[in-house]
């Protein structure tokens, strides 16, 4: 559930604030987030785990705004990071590095060193070469590096190929058939401390079964390692729980967590979860202005001021996100006849679209709201076509706070230089 609802007068509210009042000050395009929704979604995971030992590590890549990260830190959240930049963001936002897990296939020596000195909870190791690198860096610092090994269980998550991560042909993790060998190597390296088993099979999963299939394989591995004298303290099941973009019915966090814990059969192994999209996607929207309506014989276009540089998911993944009017009472058929439009941006590429074949009752100058934009929206934005990235606004009840100012044009060439 989220806190975006239409008022009886047709205005779209986020919590107790009309979005039209926000954009009068911020302009468009603008991302708007709901604090209450973010906190509700995070607590849905934390509460569902109940008394079972657990740590909820928010996936920073989903939305790394300091305002978002600070809310997570206040809740006591852990964090799943994939770069030293994300680690520094977490620390800047007040997050506890002792609750940070560091994922990713290409950790540099500087990143490993910075994370070790910050005292992170664990490295999720993706290759044998990485094991040796972490051991070497930890040795130079005279520290023990806590590690888990990311296992690739060869599970088809049934999701978009770009965000499927648990098959043998994906770049992530160690094949499960090699896991025992790699754990034995890790246990013998002097500056490593084996802590856990890690797995992340993909993103936007809408069924529980792939998670349970992966869990079964991992529990067999953990039992096998125990017979070899390697004790596993935690099991990190990653993230990946989907959200309803277009009528999907993914499991609720409580259903997902209860199924996982039930499958544990009474084991008190600490569980780590890394939700990102499931917390943030429906906690944010992208608001955009209709600049022009272009009516052709075969296709109608609503040309808006947001573009693929602001929200790349539709162009990159052919992702479907609901597009609704900012005011649903502006529907006079004389001035706003209902038509089917492709909603497109100003960027000079045919792939610059936010939605195709959408039935809308709009006029030039109206505003549209792109739902489910709180995850992988602003965080994947760019300056393509030398466009300034949008403002980000956090709503808390009847108050709205700018958590990222709209970029200024002069910032576009900061750090660039011409030849003498």
Where are these regions (language model features)?
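Active-site loop/helix belt of alpha/beta enzymes
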Residues: 1, 153-294, 354, 358, ...
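A charged N-terminal "starter" segment
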Residues: 1-145, 184, 189-193, 220-223, ...
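Charged (often Lys/Glu-rich) extended helix/loop segments that serve as interaction or gating elements
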Residues: 23, 259, 268-420
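Conserved, mostly hydrophobic/aromatic
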Residues: 38, 61, 83, 115, ...
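Glycine- and other small-residue-rich loops at beta-strand/loop junctions that grip anionic moieties
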Residues: 57-58, 79, 103-104, 123-126, ...
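Active-site-proximal loop/turn and secondary-structure-junction residues that shape catalytic pockets
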Residues: 62-64, 85-86, 106-107, 127-129, ...
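Short acidic, glycine/serine/threonine-rich loops at helix termini
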Residues: 69, 92-93, 112-117, 134-137, ...
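Hydrophobic residues within beta-strands of alpha/beta enzymes
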Residues: 79-80, 100, 123, 197, ...
């Amino acid at each position: 559930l989220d806190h975006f609802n239409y008022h009886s007068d047709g205005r779209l509210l986020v919590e107790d604030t009309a979005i039209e009042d926000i954009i009068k000050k911020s302009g468009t395009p603008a991302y708007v987030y709901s604090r209450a929704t973010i906190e509700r979604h995070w607590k849905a995971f934390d509460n569902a785990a109940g008394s079972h030992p657990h740590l909820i590590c928010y996936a920073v890549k989903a939305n790394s705004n300091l305002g978002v990260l600070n809310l997570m830190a206040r809740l006591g959240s852990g964090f799943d990071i994939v770069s030293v930049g994300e680690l520094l963001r977490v620390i800047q936002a007040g997050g506890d590095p002792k609750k940070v897990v560091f994922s990713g296939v290409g950790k540099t020596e500087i990143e490993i060193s910075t994370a070790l000195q910050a005292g992170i909870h664990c490295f999720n190791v993706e290759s044998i070469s990485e094991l040796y690198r972490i051991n070497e860096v930890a040795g130079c610092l005279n520290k023990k590096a806590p590690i888990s090994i990311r296992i690739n269980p060869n599970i088809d998550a049934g999701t978009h190929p770009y965000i499927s991560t648990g098959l043998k042909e994906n770049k992530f993790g160690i094949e499960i058939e090699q896991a025992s060998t790699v754990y034995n190597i890790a246990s013998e390296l002097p500056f490593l401390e084996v802590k856990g088993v890690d797995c992340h099979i993909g993103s936007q999963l809408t069924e529980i079964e792939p998670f349970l299939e992966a869990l079964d394989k991992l529990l067999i591995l953990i039992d096998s390692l125990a017979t070899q004298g390697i004790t596993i303290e935690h099991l990190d099941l990653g993230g990946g729980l989907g959200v309803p973009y277009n009528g999907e019915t993914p499991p609720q966090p409580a259903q997902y967590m209860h199924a996982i814990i039930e499958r544990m059969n009474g084991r008190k192994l600490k569980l780590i979860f890394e939700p990102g999209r499931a917390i943030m996607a429906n906690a944010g929207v992208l608001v955009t202005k209709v600049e022009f309506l272009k009516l052709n014989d075969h296709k109608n276009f609503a040309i808006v001021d947001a573009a693929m540089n602001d929200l790349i998911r539709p162009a990159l993944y052919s992702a479907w996100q609901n597009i609704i009017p900012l005011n649903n009472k502006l529907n006079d058929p004389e001035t706003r006849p209902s038509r089917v439009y492709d909603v497109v941006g100003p960027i000079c590429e045919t792939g610059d679209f936010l939605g195709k074949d959408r039935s809308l009752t709009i006029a030039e100058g109206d505003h549209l709201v792109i739902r489910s934009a709180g995850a992988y929206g602003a965080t994947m934005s760019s300056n393509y076509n030398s466009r300034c990235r949008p403002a980000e606004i956090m709503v808390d009840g009847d108050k709205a706070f700018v958590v990222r100012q709209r970029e200024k044009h002069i910032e576009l060439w900061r750090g660039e230089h011409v030849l003498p």
